[in-house]
């Protein structure tokens, strides 16, 4: 069986394979591998959708919990403005996009990478409680302008000049992620 998770679809193909030795009739080492397709199906759930789910369910949820723990009673309005679908000035829209590319997507991909090695029988989870910064160690550090875009409004709302999104822990529950699939 082959599973191909692409950007737009996930495709499943199940083949049987046989060897064709041609005129040699089984002697020698030259043979053709002949596939016979038994099943093929495609699904509209793809890699981009899975990454989006990880960003929503893990990264943004951890950000929301982190803001509540930092003292922000209702993080929804500020998050809606910073990372929601509200219309922004062109410069802020670009920074929102860069926040996703430099912070949210790499963390989502890191969670998916950890999930690839997840064994439901072992229940190992080496990511839970690591900070945004720790999960971004293997990629280029986010730019100051991107960090300022998210940190400054939150600092003002919290009255805490030292707030930094990179210090927040990420709550990763691989068992829960496993149950979603």
Where are these regions (language model features)?
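Nucleotide/phosphate-binding catalytic cleft detector across ATP-hydrolyzing
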Residues: 1
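Short acidic, Gly/Ser-rich segments with clustered Asp/Glu that frequently serve as metal-coordination loops
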Residues: 6-11
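Phosphate-binding glycine-rich/basic clefts of nucleotide- and phosphate-handling proteins
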Residues: 14-174
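C-terminal or late-domain output modules
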Residues: 173-181
